[in-house]
């Protein structure tokens, strides 16, 4: 059995998957915020409960926001303060007497989608998250590409390309990002960026769901806004695709629930790609909230 943990600032979610990649059991508990020992106990107790329930010693994978293992072997995860700065992988591997694998939550999202029954035919899968921020991951032959610093797939911290500034206007504001840089694309393409663009052009502070509701009602202003957003997304994604050249792009995050994102994007991409490039298949994520657990569990699938 494959045990997958999706760990965030408020909850520890465990999903148990069988050899057919089907979810058999899941359980959630609150994430301890202050005590590392309590955090380790919470994870180990869930593993012990799963072992008893299924009568086996399942493999353990964990998806967590941040950098799963720094140069000194410790976790960096600002949203999980009880475990940040601690040698989480080594400590859990020792306590559970098995190989525990960690990856960041964006890679786990991408891995979950790459192992969807319909998507396993594609060697190179790119996961793109358009949510509170912009992120994602790359999966090659069923394995995540992490890079030395676990930042592969941090697409949101690419800066706006020149052709985006040409399209939006050379006086378009380069907003300061939380990473400290200016002009990172997540400030324009995330859910918050979607709302910011609307306010920038129309001087109305609406949230993304409100704008999308207006779009669905045929509001001309909202429709013009969506056209502009999709054009900007296509420009930025075109730059990424020229480097990555995936077979499949799977889009997750809150904005993936807006059908125009996946249905109207492909037709805008060719003019931003090399003439010989083929547009990848573009799909909405299939596994929703379970994706983090699935991807974490599947860190062991290619053993």
Swiss-Prot record:
For this protein, the Enzyme Commission number is 2.7.1.59
Q: Which UniProt keywords apply?
A: ATP-binding, Carbohydrate metabolism, Kinase, Metal-binding, Nucleotide-binding, Transferase, Zinc
Question: Where, by residue number, does ATP bind?
Answer: 4-11, 133-140
> Source organism's superkingdom?
Bacteria
Gene Ontology MF terms in the entry: ATP binding; N-acetylglucosamine kinase activity; zinc ion binding
Q: Which CDD domains match?
A: ASKHA_NBD_ROK_NAGK
Q: Which InterPro entries match?
A: ATPase_NBD, N-acetyl-D-glucosamine_kinase, ROK, ROK_cs
Biological processes, Gene Ontology terms: N-acetylglucosamine metabolic process; peptidoglycan turnover
Record: residues binding Zn(2+)? 157, 177, 179, 184
Its pathway? Cell wall biogenesis; peptidoglycan recycling
Q: Which reaction does it catalyse?
A: N-acetyl-D-glucosamine + ATP = N-acetyl-D-glucosamine 6-phosphate + ADP + H(+)
Q: Which HAMAP family match?
A: GlcNAc_kinase
PANTHER family reported in the protein's UniProt record: N-ACETYL-D-GLUCOSAMINE KINASE (PTHR18964:SF162), ROK (REPRESSOR, ORF, KINASE) FAMILY (PTHR18964)
Q: Give a short account of what the protein does.
A: Catalyzes the phosphorylation of N-acetyl-D-glucosamine (GlcNAc) derived from cell-wall degradation, yielding GlcNAc-6-P.
Similarity comment: family membership: Belongs to the ROK (NagC/XylR) family. NagK subfamily.
Query: Any idea what this protein is called?
Result: N-acetyl-D-glucosamine kinase
């Amino acid at each position: 059995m494959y045990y997958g943990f999706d760990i965030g600032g408020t909850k520890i979610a465990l999903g148990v998957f069988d050899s057919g990649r089907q979810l058999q059991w899941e359980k959630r508990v609150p994430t301890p915020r202050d005590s590392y020992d309590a955090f380790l106990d919470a994870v180990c107790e869930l593993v012990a409960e799963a072992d008893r329930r299924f009568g086996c010693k399942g493999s353990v994978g964990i998806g967590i926001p941040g950098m799963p293992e720094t140069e000194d072997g410790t976790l960096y995860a600002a949203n999980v303060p009880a475990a940040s700065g601690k040698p989480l992988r080594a400590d859990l591997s020792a306590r559970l007497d098995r190989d525990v694998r960690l990856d960041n939550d964006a890679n786990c999202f991408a891995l979950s989608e790459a192992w969807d029954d319909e998507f396993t035919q594609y060697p190179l899968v790119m996961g793109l998250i358009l949510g509170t921020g912009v992120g994602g991951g790359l999966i090659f032959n069923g394995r995540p590409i992490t890079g030395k610093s676990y930042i592969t797939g941090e697409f949101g911290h690419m800066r706006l390309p020149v052709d985006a500034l040409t399209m939006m206007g050379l006086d378009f504001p380069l907003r300061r990002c939380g990473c400290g840089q200016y002009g990172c694309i997540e400030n324009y393409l995330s859910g918050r960026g979607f709302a910011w663009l609307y306010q920038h052009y129309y001087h109305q502070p609406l949230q993304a769901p409100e704008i999308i509701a207006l779009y669905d009602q045929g509001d001309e202003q909202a429709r013009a806004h969506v056209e502009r957003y999709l054009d900007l997304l296509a420009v930025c994604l075109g730059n990424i695709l020229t480097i990555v050249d995936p077979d499949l792009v799977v889009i997750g995050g809150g904005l993936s629930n807006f059908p125009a994102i996946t249905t109207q994007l492909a037709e805008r991409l060719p003019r931003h790609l090399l003439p010989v490039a083929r547009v990848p298949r573009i799909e909405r994520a299939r596994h929703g909230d379970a994706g983090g657990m699935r991807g974490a569990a599947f860190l062991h699938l290619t053993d």
